[in-house]
Amino acid sequence: MQLLFRPEVNSGRIERYGFDRLGFSAYRLAPGESVTGETGRDELGIVLLGGKCSVESAAGEWPSIGGRRNVFDGLPWAVYLPVATAFRVIAETDCDLAFCYSRAERRFQARLVTPADADIEIRGGANATRQINGIFKPDFPADRLLVVEVYTPSGNWSSYPPHKHDVHNPPGEVDLEEIYYYRIDRPAGYAIQKVYTPDRRIDQTFTVRDGELILVPEGYHPVVAAHGYNVYYLNALAGSARSMAASDDPEYAWVRETWKEKDPRLPLVR
């Protein structure tokens, strides 16, 4: 099963990767360039990974948003657009953009998310400490789409202990498709991600580099950042409920008890 992809930038296509709900597109725009589209049956989260742009839509307009040079330079800006909404994104500087789509049945209000809205959480402990910036968390008014960004310092683990969300058994776990879209702070850097099911029907380990994407259709999916390189990934999720409930791999759940303190390098951005 192919789970590692390098999305084609500026293709104009929504890549579904075999998912029922999620879709994804990547754009890199020069000043003055633009992207136009219509959300159709999807709700859409436009995340500015870097740069400054304006967003025009049938549901609202947001001029001159963004500003971080790249994901390691500050907190996120994003725009949420509901189903059946025409839009145009115009770059004011060089822009690095991620378009995260999810099939949706209900229509919600379009919204701008600014750095002041980012809900920063320092999760885990010891060398499994990481930073999570909430963009569209479960309490965000949307139908299915969930989006967060995660920073893992050099040598640290994240999505750890390994967890999964492939069974609808609330409140402990819900069934979610997930995408990991990566940025690394230096060109030679990489992360290692493993995706495996309890019965090892899926058991794959990947070396992931800047601009690559991992699909998580099911199973556990831990990540480790190579020593010397800070790792960022954008998570888009959608599924059976507006929740991020997940269950740990019981073989590794004990490590939580060993976490005495947080990694002082975090937060990496603020």
What are these regions (language model features)?
Residues 40-63, 81, 154-155, 166-213, ...:
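Glycine- and acidic-residue-biased ligand/ion/polar-headgroup-sensing regions
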